[in-house]
Amino acid sequence: MGNAKPPVRFQRANYVVTDLERSLLFYRDVLGFEVEHQHDSPADSYSYPVFAIDPSAQLRFALLTAQDQRRVMALTEIRGTPLPPAALPRRAAIVLDVADIDGVVAGARRLGLQVHPEERLETHDGRTGREVGIVDADGNLVVIYTITGVASAEPTA
């Protein structure tokens, strides 16, 4: 049967944030995601129990789309209850291949975000590039990279 559903398909990552508009300055304006949908979450939202959110808090949700990946990222804003700082060591990250790594780094710095020193990237298949870790205003880690060199071909016998 040609229409069999695959056993798994990645739908989206979600980060919890304290100020959706501030977060969009980074995710939309610097990284280039588009806001596809935004809404206040209902009081019986599944997000409350699965994220262990105080039921008295108000939630707002934004779905973000990349150029060729619809609804691949979400931001959930929690208002009305204080959030503890993000735990260290960091337990999650999103990893993004970006076309303009220097522009993203400059934009993150303009927003006052923590930007880790750039490192040389070496992939498992021998490609090389650049990578930089950026921590958003809520302590969520975003690792950006760009490939600058291709793997060298193995000599043929």
Q: What annotation goes with each model-predicted range?
A:
Residues 1-6, 10-19, 38, 59-109, 130-135, ...:
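Vicinal oxygen chelate
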Residues 5, 52-54, 63-65, 83-86, ...:
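Short secondary-structure boundary/capping segments
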Residues 12, 31, 143:
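Short catalytic micro-motifs in class I SAM-dependent methyltransferases
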Residues 16-69:
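Core segments of cupin and vicinal oxygen chelate
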Residues 44-48, 80, 123-124:
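A cross-kingdom feature marking solvent-exposed beta-strand/loop segments within repeated
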